[in-house]
């Protein structure tokens, strides 16, 4: 797998979970002899929602909610077969979305 790169993108609502998962991936890749670039924190996406408190009147009274989506980006340069196998066997928490692209 020479001259290839694995790009890993992590998404989660909890920044502690995403940092823990990124550390596990970096540890696993370094143990198998691969070079890791990152994790690079990408901008946090904040989605805000305004909801009326009252079902009838008082339109000026509203509740505000938000969902923050944290993202991290990592590149594994020149991965070995051991690296790919170790990453496939890695068990990450349920709240973390992982996207893997081979370039």
Swiss-Prot record:
InterPro entries on file: Ribosomal_uS10, Ribosomal_uS10_CS, Ribosomal_uS10_dom, Ribosomal_uS10_dom_sf
Q: What are the recorded Gene Ontology BP terms?
A: translation
- Going by the entry's taxonomy, the superkingdom of the source organism is recorded as Bacteria
Query: What keywords were assigned to this record?
Result: Ribonucleoprotein, Ribosomal protein
A GO molecular function assigned to this protein is:
tRNA binding
A GO CC term attached to the entry: ribosome
PROSITE patterns xref list: RIBOSOMAL_S10 (PS00361)
How this chain assembles, per its entry, is:
Part of the 30S ribosomal subunit.
What does the similarity note say? Belongs to the universal ribosomal protein uS10 family.
Role summary: Involved in the binding of tRNA to the ribosomes.
Q: What is this protein called?
A: Small ribosomal subunit protein uS10
Q: Write down the species.
A: Bordetella avium (strain 197N)
């Amino acid at each position: 797998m020479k001259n290839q790169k694995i790009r890993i993108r992590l998404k989660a609502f909890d920044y502690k979970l995403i940092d823990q998962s990124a550390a596990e991936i970096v540890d696993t890749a370094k143990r198998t002899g691969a070079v890791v670039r990152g994790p690079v924190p990408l901008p946090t996406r904040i989605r805000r929602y305004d909801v009326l408190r009252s079902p009838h009147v008082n339109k000026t009274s509203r509740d505000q909610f938000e969902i923050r989506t944290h993202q991290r980006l990592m590149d594994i340069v020149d991965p070995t077969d051991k690296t790919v196998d170790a990453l496939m066997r890695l068990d990450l928490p349920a709240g973390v979305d992982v996207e893997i692209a081979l370039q």
